[in-house]
Amino acid sequence: MATGKIVQIIGAVVDVEFPQSEVPSVYDALNVTDSKERLVLEVQQQLGGGVVRCIVMGSSDGLRRGVEVVNTGAPISVPVGTKTLGRIMNVLGDAIDERGEIGAEEVYSIHREAPSYEEQSNETALLETGVKVIDLVCPFAKGGKIGLFGGAGVGKTVNMMELINNIALQHSGLSVFAGVGERTREGNDFYFEMQEAGVVNVENPEESKVAMVYGQMNEPPGNRLRVALTGLTMAERFRDEGRDVLLFVDNIYRYTLAGTEVSALLGRMPSAVGYQPTLAEEMGVLQERITSTKQGSITSVQAVYVPADDLTDPSPATTFAHLDATVVLNRNIAAMGLYPAIDPLDSTSRQLDPLVVGQDHYDIARGVQQTLQRYKELKDIIAILGMDELSESDKQVVSRARKIERFLTQPYHVAEVFTGDPGVYVPLKETLRGFKGLLAGEYDDIPEQAFMYCGTIDDAIENAKKL
């Protein structure tokens, strides 16, 4: 194995000098010999003169010039297969749950080619989530890519947890959860919630249904940049075995941000808003690998932080292009106390097509959006002139739209500990029946308060009797 010496350290970026004849390839993993814990560098650039520029997969504190580095001759490789289930791993695939080594028989490189065009599957089957607003206006596809867009504190992680609860627990397949640059507390809560739900079995880890890979907020940018690829590699292995896998990534924005932090240190000129010039390429490399093949499927749910609630920011805007369904969370809806704060006018899905969901579902969803859009237009008139100046038909639209807004809310299982209301899973049939009746005016006599935080339309009728 070729050995080199560290010649320069700038934060997360380290330059290493090797003999001219033994320069490592780009993406090779290098081991630092003089380190108490395992410290790996990943080659990013060859600068000439035998010097390579690397990203540190860990903290560079305590490193010094002259320290010996050994080339492994291969990219970072992580354990895959059933041994990873029920375990928490870091970017290098090392266990961080203090329950011993992973002990997997097989390791895969985290840098892999996306499946070729011939291998990809183009079947469309709907995935029911039990969340009314999602199933109605932005239905998910099995094997699709779903983005949860929202600013700080509007409920991305809670929605993600509810989807894990509703899909992963109902769905008998396996899940991989990649925590990319999020709060350690959330990762910890998730682990214990999964134990309570029986998805993680501590005694017999191989009976678990989820593998967890964490690179949290407090970790250096190298870890946050590569941890999404580590989680994806594990999901790809399950898919290639012929399984249907769920991949949850929280949060894709932090992956971009880690790239931005490293990019300037690597000497690249920043592009718009200070992002790395390779933003679209980095996003494409990750997203193109998240795909379904003829062997199995990967359905991914990705939370996307929206800086300053601006959806035109380069990072969320680049992510949009890769998704099949976008669930947009709106701060104004959250401010009204209507949760989940999903905006039915801004959220989209490629599956909302009469050929996929059926004409009936399509008409109901478009009818709901039409009513809400008309109400949005009338709000200015109401603010200036008041309700009395509206025509009878417009008054009816406003009344129905307000009921629809409230009926789109529902209690979540994962929020039960905060609200005290038991969570509800609403089947698609019930969702469609409720909204069809609302649009047809069957429930015009029920007060709008009755529709707040209920499951099916029958719950709203029961609530009306108590008012």
UniProtKB/Swiss-Prot annotation:
Residues bound to ATP: 150-157
Function: Produces ATP from ADP in the presence of a proton gradient across the membrane. The catalytic sites are hosted primarily by the beta subunits.
Species of origin: Vibrio parahaemolyticus serotype O3:K6 (strain RIMD 2210633)
Gene Ontology terms: cellular component: plasma membrane; proton-transporting ATP synthase complex
Protein name: ATP synthase subunit beta
UniProt similarity note: Belongs to the ATPase alpha/beta chains family.
Principal location: membrane
Catalytic activity: ATP + H2O + 4 H(+)(in) = ADP + phosphate + 5 H(+)(out)
Membrane topology term: Peripheral membrane protein
Subunit text: F-type ATPases have 2 components, CF(1) - the catalytic core - and CF(0) - the membrane proton channel. CF(1) has five subunits: alpha(3), beta(3), gamma(1), delta(1), epsilon(1). CF(0) has three main subunits: a(1), b(2) and c(9-12). The alpha and beta chains form an alternating ring which encloses part of the gamma chain. CF(1) is attached to CF(0) by a central stalk formed by the gamma and epsilon chains, while a peripheral stalk is formed by the delta and b chains.
PANTHER family linked to this entry: ATP SYNTHASE (PTHR15184), ATP SYNTHASE SUBUNIT BETA, MITOCHONDRIAL (PTHR15184:SF71)
